[in-house]
Each structure stands twice: as structure tokens, then as C-alpha cells.
A protein has these predicted regions:
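Short, conserved micro-motifs composed of acidic
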Residues: 1-309
């Protein structure tokens, strides 16, 4: 472990000195004094999002015994024509949001179905966290239902869903029997969208480690982003990327480096489908490490300077 720690220190120094070209501003209007995290676009105009927050004004005033914070609910905001984010409001008060915690939203490609993690607040019985889904017609959401996966029941703790574009492959995070240690990323498949998902399988021993792999995000069906504290990096959870090779195997994960990653926890990345911009969450600039914030990232345009002599 001492050798690994030394390597991490060297990574931190090198990556801070030579950051990637992305800009990662913190979005003040979306963040609060509580934790704000887990963003998903909710329309193909890419000007409206939902995200999770433990801010005041949620469904319940109770505190989560595990985190000491309020339970998280879904909130929404819209970007106006000037590019500014408008007032943050609760997504709803009695359909998707509950007395428990809702988090890590994922919308299908038609923006009609929301998949998310739900951790109920049952006072008299034990329950785990499950993956739920709800469909939208106009501005109205259906009641959420549990996404059925073979061998998984209500006592299991699973979450952080991301799906293939045809919704036949479901990737999620869980600490399960036959895993590699800590929480791993798993994948489950089905034949059609009306079927139950099959028995989960561990994604890859190249991706998963004896540490924790969480917050998977599938982009264009062949690129998977996730966070890990088991691959080494800048500290805490770092964001990594792996791709499918020509044989359909996941490649060795690559650290996204600074400024995506920091000495804190960096996670929950989501991309615009065709542009190099999106969101992620981090506790990098917080005093107690509990106030996670939402960051926006964008690859700025490359500017060229031309010089020369004009002759007749």
C-alpha cells in the first residue's frame, strides 16, 4: 500500500501541473449548503435537468441515520435563453419523491422513462435500496415501479443505474456475493423491454477491484465511465473511463485526471450525447466533506492564431 500511496502522490503532482483541457466551473445557482449531486438531462433540448439534493424544503424533515443529513429528493431546473439556470424546485411532492432517498437519475434516450435509485425510509422493517423506474407523459409522471432483476430482492442494496440505448442492458453498482470486494459494477440483460432482467454478472476484473466501483454511466453503448477508489489516483473516488474493444471486452480503465478528479470524491459524471460537455459531482471544495456540489464541464473550442506576410 505504501508503494501505491507514493504513486498516487506522484499522480497528483503531475496531473495538477498538466491538467486536461476541460473547464469545470461549479454551478452556484444549482448548489446549496447541503449535498447536490447526480444530474440527468430530461429533454433533447438539453436545457432542463433533474438532480438530487439534501437541501431544506424536501419531503421530510427527518435525518438519515447513516449520513446525518436530510433524505435526498429530486429537484429540477431549466436553463433560460441567456444560459442561466433558473430557480430550483422539487420535481414533485408525492409521486417520485418520497420520505426516503431518491438519487442518481438516468433518462432513456427518448426522455420518457426515468430510472433511479430509491432507498426507502421504513421505520419498522429493514429494506435495501432498489432501482426504480417511472414514465412520463407530458409533465405527468407515473407511479414508480421496481425494476425486476433475477436473484435480487427488496433486502439487497443496489443502485446507480445506467442502460444501453435499447434498454436491454442494465449496469448498476452493488456489493454482492462473488464480487471482487467492496462495491462492484454489475450488468444484467433482457430480451425485450417488457422482460425481467436476467441474473447479474460481474462486469470485469479489469474494471472492478477489491475497493469500490460506483456510479457507472454508459455513453454511446461502448464507453463506460465510473468512479473508483481501488484503481489509484488523486484520492477518494476518482472518475475513470473504459471502452469495449473489438472482442467485446472492457479495456484497462483510464483516469480522467485533473480537473475532473481531485483529492476528494469525484463521481456521477454524465455527458451530452454528442458534445464534450456535461456534469459531475464532487466534495473537493467543502469544509466537512459532506457538502457535495454539482460541477459543469466543457471542452473549450480550439483557437488558432495565424501569422504571415501578405504580398501582392
Amino acid at each position: 500500500r505504501g508503494v501505491a500511496a507514493l504513486a498516487d502522490i506522484e499522480n497528483i503532482q503531475a496531473w495538477i501541473e498538466t491538467p486536461t483541457k476541460y473547464e469545470v466551473p461549479r454551478i452556484k445557482k444549482l448548489n446549496s449548503r447541503a449535498s447536490d449531486f447526480g444530474v440527468a438531462w430530461t429533454s433533447n433540448n438539453y436545457n432542463e435537468i433533474i438532480f438530487s439534493s439534501t437541501r431544506e424544503g424536501g419531503i421530510t424533515k427527518e435525518k438519515d441515520a447513516i449520513t446525518g443529513q436530510s433524505f435526498s429528493d429530486f429537484y429540477t431546473s431549466r436553463q433560460n435563453k441567456q444560459g442561466e439556470w433558473e430557480e430550483v424546485t422539487l420535481l414533485d411532492e408525492d409521486v417520485i419523491n418520497s420520505a426516503g432517498s431518491e438519487g442518481m437519475p438516468f433518462m432513456n434516450k427518448s426522455y420518457t422513462t426515468l430510472y433511479f435509485t430509491s432507498c426507502p425510509n421504513h421505520k419498522k422493517r429493514t429494506s435495501g435500496c432498489q432501482i426504480m423506474k417511472a414514465t412520463r407523459s407530458g409533465s405527468t409522471w407515473s407511479d414508480p415501479v421496481t425494476v425486476e432483476i433475477k436473484t435480487i430482492d427488496s433486502l439487497d442494496v443496489i443502485g446507480h443505474p445506467t442502460l444501453s440505448s435499447d434498454e436491454l442492458k442494465l449496469y448498476f453498482a452493488s456489493e454482492r456475493k462473488n464480487g471482487l470486494g467492496g462495491k462492484d459494477i454489475w450488468v444484467s440483460e433482457r430480451e425485450s423491454t417488457g422482460d425481467k432482467f436476467g441474473r447479474p454478472r460481474n462486469l470485469s476484473d479489469l474494471v472492478n477491484t477489491i475497493g469500490n466501483e460506483l456510479y457507472p454511466y454508459l455513453r454511446n453503448d461502448s464507453t463506460l465511465y465510473f468512479s473508483s477508489d481501488g484503481h489509484g489516483g488523486m484520492g477518494g473516488l476518482d472518475i475513470f473511463v473504459t471502452t469495449l474493444d473489438s472482442l467485446g471486452e472492457w479495456t484497462e480503465p483510464i483516469n480522467l485526471r485533473h480537473p475532473f478528479n481531485s483529492i476528494g470524491n469525484d463521481y456521477g459524471i454524465t455527458f451530452h450525447p454528442t458534445e464534450e460537455r456535461g456534469f459531475f459531482s464532487s466534495n473537493r471544495d467543502t469544509k466537512n466533506g459532506l457538502d457535495d456540489d454539482i460541477y459543469y464541464f466543457i471542452e473549450p473550442p480550439v483557437l488558432f492564431t495565424l501569422s504571415g506576410t501578405i504580398k501582392n
